[in-house]
C-alpha cells in the first residue's frame, strides 16, 4: 500500500488540514506555518502522486479525496488551494458530520469557462495538457508564473513556488495530466450549494486563473458561504500577503466555527 505524506505540528488546539495545488507539494505552506502555529495544529499533506507521496499513480478526484480522508483527523478545518480546493470540497461534501469547516483559496467549483461561467478557457487547459508531454519542466514553470502575475512581488513569489517544486520529487507526467483533467472537467457548483457546514472562500483580486467575477455569482448561489477578497493578491495570496491571509483564517475559525453557525 502506498503511503501518503502527512506531517502534523505539535502546536495549536484546532486541527487545520492544508491541501496544495496542481504541480506542487506541502512545502508551499511554509510561508504561513509559523504564523498559524499559535492558532492551529497544522496537517501538511502531499496529495497522492505529488511531492513525497510518489508511490501513487494518477487518481480521479473522488479517489484522491477518499485516500486523503483515510489519514484525516475528525472535526478538522479543511483548507484547499486551487486544485486542493476541489479535493477539500469533495471531502467536506462526503463527510459533513466529521468536518468542522471548509476553506477554499483561489479555487473554483468549476475551473473551465462556459458561456455563462467565468473561468479558464478550456483550450488553455488543453494546451497545458499537450505541452506537458513535449516540455514537462517548462510547462510547469509557465503554470507557476501565471499564479503570481500582477502582484508587486510577482517575481519573488514565482521563484518561491519554483523552489517548492524543486525541493521535492516532481509528480509524473501522468499525475499532472490527470490533475489538469480534474481542473478541466470537475463541476461541484450544485453539490456545494447544499453544503451545511461553515464555508469560507478566499480570492485574490488579481488572480488570472480564477476570475473575481465568480465571487458575486457564488455569493448568490451559495448564501450560506462567506467570501473574502484580498485586493492586492493574485492566485497565491498566502505567499504574497501571509499576515492578511492568516488573519482571515483565524477570524473565520473563531467567528464561524467555534461560535457555531
Swiss-Prot record:
GO molecular function terms noted in the UniProt entry: pimelyl-[acyl-carrier protein] methyl ester esterase activity
Gene3D superfamilies: alpha/beta hydrolase (3.40.50.1820)
Keywords: Biotin biosynthesis, Cytoplasm, Hydrolase, Serine esterase
Enzyme Commission code: 3.1.1.85
Pfam families tied to this protein: Abhydrolase_1
Subcellular location: Cytoplasm
Domain AB hydrolase-1: 16-241
Residues annotated for substrate binding in this entry: 22, 82-83, 143-147, 235
rRNA processing among keywords: no
GO BP annotations, alphabetical order: biotin biosynthetic process
Swiss-Prot/TrEMBL catalytic activity: 6-carboxyhexanoyl-[ACP] methyl ester + H2O = 6-carboxyhexanoyl-[ACP] + methanol + H(+)
Pathway: Cofactor biosynthesis; biotin biosynthesis
Subunit description: Monomer.
Family: Belongs to the AB hydrolase superfamily. Carboxylesterase BioH family.
Function summary: The physiological role of BioH is to remove the methyl group introduced by BioC when the pimeloyl moiety is complete. It allows to synthesize pimeloyl-ACP via the fatty acid synthetic pathway through the hydrolysis of the ester bonds of pimeloyl-ACP esters.
Name the UniProt record assigns to this protein: Pimeloyl-[acyl-carrier protein] methyl ester esterase
Gene (name only): bioH
Amino acid at each position: 500500500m502506498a503511503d501518503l505524506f502527512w506531517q502534523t505540528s505539535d502546536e495549536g488546539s484546532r486541527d487545520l488540514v492544508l491541501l496544495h495545488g496542481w504541480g506542487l507539494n506541502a512545502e508551499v505552506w511554509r510561508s504561513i506555518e509559523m504564523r498559524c502555529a499559535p492558532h492551529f495544529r497544522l496537517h501538511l499533506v502531499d496529495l497522492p502522486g505529488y511531492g513525497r507521496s510518489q508511490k501513487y499513480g494518477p487518481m480521479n478526484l473522488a479517489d484522491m479525496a477518499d485516500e486523503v480522508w483515510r489519514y484525516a483527523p475528525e472535526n478538522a478545518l479543511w483548507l484547499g488551494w486551487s486544485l486542493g480546493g476541489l479535493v477539500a470540497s469533495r471531502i467536506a461534501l462526503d463527510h459533513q458530520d466529521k468536518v468542522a469547516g471548509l476553506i477554499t483559496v483561489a479555487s473554483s467549483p468549476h475551473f473551465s469557462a462556459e458561456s455563462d461561467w467565468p473561468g479558464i478557457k478550456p483550450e488553455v487547459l488543453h494546451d497545458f495538457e499537450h505541452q506537458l508531454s513535449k516540455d514537462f519542466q517548462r510547462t510547469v514553470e509557465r503554470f507557476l508564473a501565471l499564479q503570481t502575475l500582477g502582484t508587486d512581488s510577482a517575481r519573488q513569489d514565482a521563484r518561491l513556488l519554483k523552489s517548492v517544486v524543486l525541493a521535492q520529487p516532481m509528480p509524473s507526467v501522468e499525475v499532472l495530466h490527470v490533475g489538469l483533467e480534474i481542473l478541466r472537467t470537475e463541476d461541484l457548483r450544485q453539490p456545494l450549494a447544499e453544503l451545511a457546514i461553515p464555508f469560507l472562500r478566499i480570492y485574490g483580486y488579481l488572480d488570472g486563473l480564477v476570475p473575481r467575477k465568480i465571487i458575486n455569482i457564488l455569493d448568490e448561489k451559495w448564501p450560506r458561504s462567506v467570501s473574502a477578497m484580498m485586493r492586492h493578491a493574485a492566485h497565491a495570496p498566502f505567499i504574497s500577503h501571509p499576515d492578511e491571509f492568516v488573519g482571515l483564517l483565524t477570524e473565520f475559525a473563531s467567528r464561524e466555527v467555534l461560535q457555531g453557525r
